[in-house]
């Protein structure tokens, strides 16, 4: 049922409105894309949030940006698809389930794999939809009929296909490599799951004696416990201090192992003593050096973070206890030289919250170089993708050029189980590094392969590990559209159009998607990559769960409405890729920024209600378009501003300058339309000239209809509600599916805009003078406008009716020069002097007293600000932005003082 204008509430109420439209959009499949449409496709796949997650402000920001792009392109006639979905988040889900089991006094091993996975799927069914429901609260225009999950049947098939293809091409292998190992979760973790944290630690200096007894070398380390696995000491080949020692050996203290002194250009002669201990099994740089010099790999740690049998007397100790014990033993033996305080960064497991241990482990790897090469060729050619902002292209290129082989196995149960089966019957029933294996799509296929290789009695055991979550995420842009099958969706919507993502995960995810897509589809997965910044809190700090400074978007949605939050976040963007700051009072759950956007929604609502109540119950279609010859000056001006705004808006959105687009709309709607045009046409709406009234109605209806379409991608709910009332259409039609306005260049008249701006400046100045004189709102005045320019005087003559109406001016005089100056308050625009004669209007003595007091107050402020700026203590120590703001305040105060002195001088004359 359509609401009439007279039935509209006097204030916009988002709570009921937003839920209603979200329900209607979804029930009618308003945003379902058609793979058979002849329209140009435009596709964005959602960066899949973790199925464990709940909506945070980063999600709200990203979803708001994507929805502007999707709604805009849909209204531009594109076959727009926003494909939703969630990620299975192996480590996150398993962490939650392990915690639940611990509370029950159980472990996953007590349950067994099958029961554990049943529980995981049950948890996913019950709790995994939270973030999807919260995304719906944002009013996102996704195609829910195409919702995907990284472990659904189709994506699981894609993961299997990708793994087997890569394995058969020799691009997946098992091997020993240093991985990021989390002793808490006892699993390899990706680089992305590691956070560098600065800590106050120590740098220990030890003597390593030369085997021939001729002296010693001094090495420094932050991890003394790993010295038990040293297999060399390295120096720079150009370091003259040590050139004579290269090739000799030292005897490793505590272990009594003889190890060589090697030369390697990686060693920085200036760092520490210029000698470094080399532990290839416990440090990535040492591992690379060990490969170059064919050094043995000695692991001294178990997977749980305790020391193993290679640690000798320290076997069984926790790694940090071993650190203390090793230092004590070296000190007692006379090998400790000194200890220095040392602040450095250590890698922390994002999930286990403990320091990561570089650990030698047999894992599954993807050979990255051939995949990265294909992505680099695309970047260097025409395929792209294009990064916005462009500066991220170089960083992306650097990542592709410096990637190491990707460890894809994780010691978890929740996820895509690696499709490899070990012939344990060949190695006494256990899996070892030498156990032969087969790779297959199913257990049955694996059995057939194994029987062919090892005979009918072969016993198989599937690899217990699962694939890194990023493996399935890397296939996301094309697997969600049906790959490896050649589906209509894949043919229509792939490559996708735009990827919208934050820079914090770009190179772990974006690079993997481009590499996988280039390899499996021969195409880059998206044309553009739009990088947005982070949402920072009221103290300009990065929001994070660990810092506890996140802001729940749903709290602000409940208080201000979805449209207000969406618009506030987008309007805060200053240039693509820049972080935004959101103010928030944690005691009251209030945000001035979001409140401003809520007020804007109310302004749009109230202005629309006023317009509709003055259209005589007619729709824009019924009123029709005004004849050009009948348009008055204000009509032509608002049409010029409307088409110029439309043109700018289209250019800004297509350039991903969404913050500028939001600001442009705000200024046009609140400023040009509400503050000026509506006020200018009110006399015509209430006047007796029927033709002038009709033209005003036609123009108001036309501009309001256009505004609702322009604003819809940013504020979809309030605009949908108003549009239905304005056009009196049923709930089976949607503004979301209407066409976006097209600018008509013949209506854009920059000269008219300049003329009208002159009038606006004059009206503002006169209003300010009225306020300064303390006049009552309805009190009539006379005014004088003085300009040297004949064309300006002519323009002011044409618009003087508007000036008189909006400033309550009875008599307006426009002159080239003043023959005599009356006692008046004087203001100036850029080119016009505006005089408000005061005779008979105010008590001049009282006004002079008021101005004098104001001047005294401003002069005190100038003295205070000058004092601060003359203090080197303030200028040198205060934050730069505070000093700059103080300088601006001083300039403003000096201008104000000059103006007040001028006014007092004129009044006293």
Curated annotation (Swiss-Prot):
A motif ('HIGH' region) lies at residues 49-59. It is found in: Cytoplasm. ATP binds at residue 545. It comes from the Bacteria. GO terms for cellular component: cytosol. ValRS has two distinct active sites: one for aminoacylation and one for editing. The misactivated threonine is translocated from the active site to the editing site. The C-terminal coiled-coil domain is crucial for aminoacylation activity. Belongs to the class-I aminoacyl-tRNA synthetase family. ValS type 1 subfamily. This is Valine--tRNA ligase. It is an enzyme of class 6 (ligase). Monomer. Catalyzes the attachment of valine to tRNA(Val). As ValRS can inadvertently accommodate and process structurally similar amino acids such as threonine, to avoid such errors, it has a 'posttransfer' editing activity that hydrolyzes mischarged Thr-tRNA(Val) in a tRNA-dependent manner. Pfam families: Anticodon_1 (PF08264), tRNA-synt_1 (PF00133), Val_tRNA-synt_C (PF10458). SUPFAM superfamilies: Anticodon-binding domain of a subclass of class I aminoacyl-tRNA synthetases, Nucleotidylyl transferase, tRNA-binding arm, ValRS/IleRS/LeuRS editing domain. The keyword Cell membrane does not apply. It catalyses: tRNA(Val) + L-valine + ATP = L-valyl-tRNA(Val) + AMP + diphosphate. A motif ('KMSKS' region) lies at residues 542-546. Residues 841-909 form a coiled coil. GO terms for biological process: valyl-tRNA aminoacylation. The keyword Ligase applies. The gene is valS. Its EC number is 6.1.1.9. It comes from Synechococcus sp. (strain ATCC 27144 / PCC 6301 / SAUG 1402/1). Keywords: Aminoacyl-tRNA synthetase, ATP-binding, Coiled coil, Cytoplasm, Ligase, Nucleotide-binding, Protein biosynthesis. GO terms for molecular function: aminoacyl-tRNA deacylase activity; ATP binding; valine-tRNA ligase activity.
